[in-house]
């Protein structure tokens, strides 16, 4: 529920045509509903979005298939070059959380190899790549890069409006909690600690409203 509409259209159109029916797995609460219920945004410390919206729904789905007697392999399309953590992942390993083997068939591939296989099968890429996105997923992720924030602001300003509305709604819940607990109120924001401003290079705990983050995304490196 937090992907760009073009991604859903891509799944239900070109990919379904080439691969056959695709099962869409959904959590009981989508991203915005989950944030409103918790009265807070996901963060690097409390990354509940991944667990509640991806991991748990997948676990329930796989468990249902396994209970029906199926032997499963969880194939994941990630590449080692995408991050330091992914560079340490093997092609095959057992995942206790999903109770099955995970297979990463393109873990050692280059970006060009991914492009080539799309061309070989006559499959256009996700349209977001053609708009300038360097990766496709949550729109945006709490870990979005500066360039990704700028892209969203330029190509999908309505998303920025949705984020601002969500920040206003979460602020109401956060203010109530602060008053109840006798704490100083700090306005929550989607992007927490977007940049470091301290001398030692550590993040200073600031939460910037989405408009300020967008403004920062348009600055030069180091801005």
Outline where the language-model segments fall:
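ATP-dependent adenylation/nucleotidyltransferase module used to activate substrates
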Residues: 1-121
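ATP/NTP-dependent adenylation/nucleotidyl-transfer catalytic domains that generate, transfer
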Residues: 126, 131-223
